[in-house]
Amino acid sequence: VTSSETDKPKQPSHRRAKNAQRRVTAADVAGAVGLSRATVGFVLNDTPGQTIPEHTRERVLDAARRLGYRPHPAARALASGQSHIILLVLPDWPIDFAMRRHIEEATLALDEAGYSLVTYNPLHAARARPLWETLQPDVVMSLTLLSPERLEQLHAAGIRRIVPDPTHVDLDEYTEEGPALQVAHLVSRGHHNLAFAGSADPRLSDLVRERRERAAASARDAGVSFVDAGAVSVGDDSAARAVAAARAAGATAVVAYNDDVAVALVGAALRQGLRVPEDLAVIGHDDIPLAASVYPSITSVRLDVAGLGRYLAGIALGMAEDSPLPQTAPPRLLTVVERDSA
């Protein structure tokens, strides 16, 4: 070994690792096949209007596969005008079973069309740049109607394709019918004195209010009495207090905000020596797996969140590809699942 070889400076290990992880570029592909970068770019980008011999195209694509070439997302978006990213802006709600199913189905539907769904929960006092400014999504989706301030932010970032669009879908029609079905089911079972029990989670306050108001309106329409039994939290005696309040008001059945509240109410009623549903009936909402697993099992309202997720994904795809949007919303996706509690 010569002194020049031993004295030769070695490349730092972090630099060797960085080089090993370097992204394969179109220039690497061009060097491998001995063609110009322009020709290789035409093939890799499938540029229209270029006459490239088929055997040349195959050489380029074979080399790209062999080298592990992947187009740079930003460069591809710049060339095509699309990022193939759909951004789902989440509200500040708990990620419950229904929301997970909604996101899963929307993700599957978009993936089938070659799009990626990215979820984002913007903080009220966030210091980081909004994700829609860095990802350049083709469409921004939301589970609720966005506020005027949020819409202004999106428009300032150059985003015009936003779901839901009030001209195409009204999400309220899928949330308002659930409490009406709860009340109708209890009335059909002969109950004339109803109570409502909400959730104490502050993140759900708006949804709790909407469901309570809708249930109260349905009770008035049916000519039955309706009282508010209070909010229920997991892990304290609030469910017991709600059961006591409902009984004190003469209620024989409770409309629960969701199945978690319904399970807590049923447990509290049993501990107070009440029979369910003979002394107190309880109906939940959302039909989570737990509803069928407890005893007495929970009668609940099921929303086909999978169908709704695919429908909204279809609107997003139509906007992203400038293709016709679904003209009609899916049929009512809410049904009562009858079990033991009501």
Where are these regions (language model features)?
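An alpha-beta-alpha
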Residues: 182-224, 328-341
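N-terminal helix-turn-helix DNA-binding module of bacterial transcription factors
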Residues: 1-81
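Short beta-strand elements in bilobed, periplasmic/extracellular small-molecule ligand-binding domains
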Residues: 110-121, 195-196, 212, 216-236
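Short beta-strand segments enriched in small/hydrophobic residues
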Residues: 39-42, 78-93, 193-201
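Hydrophobic alpha-helical segments within soluble ligand-binding/sensing domains
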Residues: 169-197, 214, 236-244, 301-322
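Alpha-helical recognition/docking segments in bacterial nutrient-uptake
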Residues: 1-6, 21, 81, 85-184, ...
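Flexible loop/turn connectors
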Residues: 240, 244-342
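Short acidic capping loops at alpha-helix termini that bridge into adjacent secondary structure
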Residues: 193, 227-229, 276-281
